[in-house]
From Swiss-Prot:
Name under which the protein is recorded: UDP-N-acetylglucosamine--dolichyl-phosphate N-acetylglucosaminephosphotransferase
Pathway entry: Protein modification; protein glycosylation
InterPro entries on file: DPAGT1_ins, Glycosyl_transferase_4, GPT
Entry's transmembrane regions: 11-40, 61-80, 94-120, 124-145, 169-188, 195-215, 221-244, 253-271, 274-295, 378-402
Binding site for Mg(2+): 187, 254
Activity regulation info: Inhibited by natural nucleoside antibiotic tunicamycin, which acts as a structural analog and competitor of UDP-GlcNAc.
Enzyme Commission (EC) number: 2.7.8.15
Residues at which UDP-N-acetyl-alpha-D-glucosamine binds: 46-48, 58, 193, 303-305
Parts of the chain on the Cytoplasmic side: 41-60, 121-123, 189-194, 245-252, 296-377
The keyword Magnesium is assigned to this record: yes
BP GO annotations: dolichol-linked oligosaccharide biosynthetic process
Residue intervals annotated with topology Lumenal: 1-10, 81-93, 146-168, 216-220, 272-273, 403-410
Gene Ontology MF terms: glycosyltransferase activity; metal ion binding; UDP-N-acetylglucosamine-dolichyl-phosphate N-acetylglucosaminephosphotransferase activity; UDP-N-acetylglucosamine-lysosomal-enzyme N-acetylglucosaminephosphotransferase activity
Length: 410
């Protein structure tokens, strides 16, 4: 399908890159231009980790998301240019066109639902339902275009399951859960300037490198498809990060977290590298597992779990969840004890007028790093977390191209 003139890059990718660079300029320009509009609409808030009471525009992910969509809407004809010349195209590749449109529909739905969350401040149960609904077009595209639900079984399990295993509907459940996880994973690992956009930028850069390496492989078309989305996403996110970096002049909002997560889910599923995609999310997976006791309210969870600012030192310190000891269930007590023994949490107990109370640090990767390294300046904490994301990507490439031999025949 992708038979284009010999260029350093295929023509559609070159057009995509040029459009993405224009998208970077547009994002950098539009965000300050719309600042007053968001503040007038009361889509603004204060940075809780700053002494300043200045109002900062929120939900700016809707701007980078809109620029991203405009780039790709204008780009739609270019992968199919050969079909405009009759002798170069025997039949129009409808399945590839459907994949492109279906992917854009899923991302567009997620941007809309994310913005609705920012405006309406939805509950957590809704945050799980929204990505599920937005992923349905994606699953239908996979069903109509591919429909393959058979996986290659890793070597250690082949003596039980055989070489191949057809998961059937469970494979679609897995893809739906992947979309839900990706959209919420970035949202959970958030709360300091530049972190949401920064981690997304590192992940997208890692995927771009992975796609470029795989262009010489057997699945060239899938990785070109992924690049069509990742290159514009990288540059629009870079424009957003320019304004969101410490000290942040804008907040990205849940809109960006959902937009980023669904974009990653789209390329992972339709690009057929969902396992590699999950490896790029190692810090987010750890943060999710570490946060589970609070997310399921086994251990009391405050509305905001971001670290707190020490006004005297100007550094961030761990934030805590304080609750009555008698209100903690047996399971919560057990989890807290195990986590304390593993030095994953700091627990304080004491007495107050209301009786015995327990206090533990909020269970996020951000607070865990503050527990390990002590109080850190916000900018340095963001850099530390992004360094961890880069190391995670390096580990992913090592697993994907070296350790994979232990599990699969490559």
């Amino acid at each position: 399908m992708w038979a284009f003139p010999e260029l350093p890059l295929p023509l559609p990718l070159l057009v995509n890159l040029i459009g993405s660079l224009l998208g970077f300029v547009a994002t950098v320009t539009l965000i300050p231009a719309f600042r007053s509009h968001f503040i007038a609409a009361r889509l603004c808030g204060q940075d809780l980790n700053k002494l300043s009471q200045q109002q900062i525009p929120e939900s700016q992910g809707v701007i980078s998301g809109a620029v991203f969509l405009i780039i790709l809407f204008c780009f739609i004809p270019f992968p199919f240019l050969n079909c405009f010349v009759e002798e170069q195209c025997k039949a129009f590749p409808h399945h590839e066109f459907v994949a492109l449109i279906g992917a854009l529909l899923a991302i567009c739905c997620m941007i809309f639902l994310g913005f609705a969350d920012d405006v309406l401040n939805l509950r957590w149960r809704h945050k799980l339902l929204l990505p599920t609904a937005a992923s349905l077009p994606l699953l239908m595209v996979y069903f109509t275009n591919f429909g393959n639900t058979t996986i290659v079984v890793p070597k250690p399990f082949r003596w039980i399951l055989g070489l191949h295993l057809d998961l059937g509907i469970l494979y679609y459940v897995y893809m739906g859960l992947l979309a839900v996880f990706c959209t919420n994973a970035i949202n959970i690992l958030a709360g300091i300037n530049g972190l949401e956009a920064g981690q997304s930028l590192v992940i997208s850069a890692s995927i771009i490198v992975f796609n470029l390496v795989e262009l010489e492989g057997d699945y060239r078309d899938d990785h070109i498809f992924s690049l069509y989305f990742m290159i514009p996403f990288f540059f629009t996110t870079l424009g957003l990060l320019y304004h969101n970096w410490y000290p942040s002049r804008v907040f990205v909002g849940d809109t960006f977290c959902y937009f980023a997560g669904m974009t990653f889910a789209v390329v992972g599923i339709l690009g057929h590298f969902s396992k590699t995609m999950l490896l790029f999310f190692m810090p987010q997976v750890f943060n999710f597992l570490y946060s589970l006791p609070q997310l399921f309210h086994i251990i009391p969870c405050p509305r905001h779990r971001m670290p707190r600012l020490n006004a005297k030192t100007g550094k961030l310190e761990m934030s805590y969840s304080k609750f009555k000891t008698k209100n903690l269930s047996f399971l919560g007590t057990f989890i807290l004890k195990v986590a304390e023994n593993l030095r994953l949490v700091t627990v304080h107990q004491g007495e107050s007028e209301d009786g015995a109370f327990t206090e533990c640090n909020n269970m996020t990767l951000i607070n865990l790093l503050l527990k390990v390294f002590g109080p850190i300046h916000e900018r340095n904490l963001t850099l530390l977390l992004l360094l961890l994301q880069v190391l995670s990507s390096a580990a992913t490439f090592s697993i994907r191209y070296q350790l994979v031999r232990l599990f699969y025949d490559v």
